[in-house]
UniProtKB/Swiss-Prot annotation:
Belongs to the SecA family. This is Protein translocase subunit SecA. SUPFAM superfamilies: Helical scaffold and wing domains of SecA (SSF81886), P-loop containing nucleoside triphosphate hydrolases (SSF52540), Pre-protein crosslinking domain of SecA (SSF81767). One of its GO terms (cellular component) is plasma membrane. It comes from the Bacteria. It is found in: Cell inner membrane; Cytoplasm. The lineage of its organism: Bacteria, Pseudomonadati, Chlorobiota, Chlorobiia, Chlorobiales. Transmembrane segments: none annotated. It comes from Pelodictyon phaeoclathratiforme (strain DSM 5477 / BU-1). Pfam families: P-loop_SecA, SEC-C, SecA_DEAD, SecA_PP_bind, SecA_SW. Keywords: ATP-binding, Cell inner membrane, Cell membrane, Cytoplasm, Membrane, Metal-binding, Nucleotide-binding, Protein transport, Translocase, Translocation, Transport, Zinc. ATP binds at residues 143, 161-165, 661. Its EC number is 7.4.2.8.
Amino acid sequence: MLKIFEKIFGSKHEKDIKKIRPLVSSINELQMTMASLSNDQLRERGVTLKQRVRKTLEPLEQEKTSLSRKLDNPDINLEEAETINTRLDTLAEEYEQATAAILEELLPETFALVKESCVRLKGHTYLVMGREMIWDMVPYDVQLIGGIVLHSGKISEMATGEGKTLVSTLPVFLNALTGRGVHVVTVNDYLAQRDKEWMSPVFAFHNLSVGVILNTMRPEERREQYACDITYGTNNEFGFDYLRDNMASTPEEMVQRNFYYAIVDEVDSVLIDEARTPLIISGPVPNADNSKFQEIKPWIEQLVRAQQQLVAKYLGEAEKLIKTKPGDPEAGLALLRVKRGQPKNTRYIKMLSQQGMAKLVQGTENEYLKDNSSRMQEVDDELYFAVDEKANTIDLTDKGRDFLSKLSHQDSDIFMLPDVGSEVAIIESDALIPVADKIQKKDEVYRLFADRSERLHNISQLLKAYSLFERDDEYVVQNGQVMIVDEFTGRILPGRRYSDGLHQAIEAKENVKIEGETQTMATITIQNFFRLYKKLAGMTGTAETEASEFYEIYKLDVVVIPTNASIVRKDMDDLVYKTRREKYNAVVLKVEELQKKGQPVLVGTTSVEVSETLSRMLRARKIVHNVLNARQNDREAEIVAEAGQKNAVTIATNMAGRGTDIKLGSGVRELGGLFILGSERHESRRIDRQLRGRAGRQGDPGESVFFVSLEDELMRLFGSDRVISVMDRLGHEEGDVIEHSMITKSIERAQKKVEEQNFSIRKRLLEYDDVLNQQREVIYSRRRNGLIKDRLTSDILDLLRDYSELVIKKHHKMLDVDAIEEQLMRELSIEFKPERNTFEREGIEATAEKLYQTALAFYRRKEAAMPEEIMQQIEKYAVLSVIDLRWREHLREIDSLREGINLRAYGQKDPLLEYKQEAFRLFIDLLHDIELETLSLAFKLFPVNPDEAREMEERQRKAAVRQEKLIAQHKAAESVYTASSDEPETNQEESPQQPAIAEKKPGRNDLCPCGSGKKYKNCHGQQP
């Protein structure tokens, strides 16, 4: 029905293009009028455009500067400050609207200017990545359309070879006129450097500065590159610089400007494929135990071997039953246990290709999944552990726990989590147990739960490493390190590690050095990072299949740009075989046939392992070829350059699909162009389309086909019963192949199923991260304010006023003047004790004002007693150090909350709703802690010379040792807050003297110093 409407009324993309066509005509007419101008006159037109933008925006900028100065005045009253802040918010919106309007007005002239500049540059010789290039690019009409779409903040889908890199220069130039900086995001450093050098002539012609951010650059170099009008770089570099800027100690350490406009090249790779992996800056965990995996590894290896033997037994039983009673339910149950016990078992996978086997297993599984999987436990109970390959989870069974308890010579209970709620309830209800003993017993329950929980988590991660993660598929081992391989591109991801201890488990499995455990210091997801930009756009050859996700997550519309020349590539239906062996043999025979003909062929694979298997088979037949995978990526440019030559055979993982153009050699066009041979369907249709797109660029001929087997991952996990039924009905013999459009469509349906599942994962991740993102914005805004403002006195005094009221309110009901005196001495080091009768008579407001004035007088005396520069340092240090420390702790608490929140679903609660409520409560606690500790530090910090600092640290160390030996009374805890500074030593010759911390409270998650055994936040840390 939809197709009928599209034929009558036209598709969405046709309507989008139709609207833009008149603008393209205007651009071309303007460009023709510029042809008579000299180069200097053309440059002058560019200067004029910039001046018009400046003239439009200058009044708004001047008003903003004036209002900001007023806001910095320490004598400004609250009402006036609120009025100014409201106007600043409105002004920001007006500024963006004015910017959009003037750029829209200047678009035709600017695009015409860029096009004419490209004409002038024709024949210009320059270097790109050390190779001599001659400029021969002038935008076609379809490229102008692509540029207009990008400027509009949308995604341009442009076929391979249509010149996306040149297209980007048009909106980049236009938006660079604002002087706010434009970011062009690529997928790797090589492409960032190449594109910057490749496109720089058109920008240099008009004196626009161009920079590039590379992984090896130092902060000062990065700052210079970000100051340019246009900056190229990768999403990781831009994202990590954002996180590092929000950890900076001084404004001079920050490298980025504001986030105005970004164009993301290969936008589907960056915003979708990378979206499941958050950017994380982590630091080492103090006193972390890295031997925990080594201790349990021998047990797990024996457990895995026992499971393999058990699986082999079930396979044998199934084979016997099938010979005598085909379709026997007992055979189906045995095979289902094999699937749940060792899903990647090669014998099992081969068996599935036999007639009726896949259907038998699927039918049995459906039977046991009925009634909310209530009977699946009957299947799993006979195994040592159960593997759910789709969900990527592993559960230890009672049989597995018994096995481990015998190996470890310990009770099997140590591999089970205690019921904390029941245990605590029993302790609480026992009237015979003294209060102090109750606290101790409850702490023992919590400690037992934590120990067992960690042990079970480590066991689960090791089992995953042995059962679900295969070397040369999900990862490779290079130079004694486990390196993750990108599932979408086949590239190695240096520096990236699996989370939750999984990477350490794989390191233990592979007998390489287990790297230290880390803790998160700063994190952001790709989705939320790119939402920081005022305007975002993207370009790729494959976005249409993910259009709904782009719009739902990023509010980005996808516009398919027509090709300059019609695509004549011939895309054939999939060829389906029963087994991988048959498929590989067919691939080799096809490659041999094509090479004899002279037609170049690119064989696409989904993993390093498959690429090397095919390479061995080709070598055995003496077929000369190149291999491009995660192990040979250093020759990428050279291999890709040769891939379109006559007789060329290239085997490549998906890494050959991004940022590369394969140009045809002499005589290849007549042979049919480049032949794309996919050795397996990827789980994403986009990746398959990207592979096909290597052929047929700019109207070149080409062919593409996929060879598929029922043993492939996609078919095994998500292949439709329909494909299996057709194969069974036709009764295909070994080596036979099916080629039919129905099969191809069924495979695409399976891919769609996986894409939907992955989308739901990414969407769920974003829903969770949105909670943290709102908190991150508040914290980073406060931190940036503390970093950039010269004086923070007014902020400190605002905190003091709120604090004064809180303290007085807390103790007014009981008229506890002694508690007020003790709290103020402890937290602010000031003396204040109201008379009891006066306190009762004057009430909260008047007493709070007295306290505020007393504390203010103390603070003013402190200010007068030291140089202004030192006081500024103290205030900044108080604000920044507390925010950094507490934010790190908060991230750790949020991580812990996320790990266990899904278990709430068993209690008929929505985990996301529970997470939002818990995270909000934690955040309120965090803000309270930050405000109190910032105020406390600002009052109690004094500069000391090095000798005094050493003497003070020694006193504190001795005091801490004494404290450990004491069993302090519960009430006396608040007098023992002594600890040395966590800050590194500073070179006093190179930087101003740093304030030393005279006192520091325990962390919220540390044990309370009172000896109660509770966490500090649940004990004496509850006080304001």
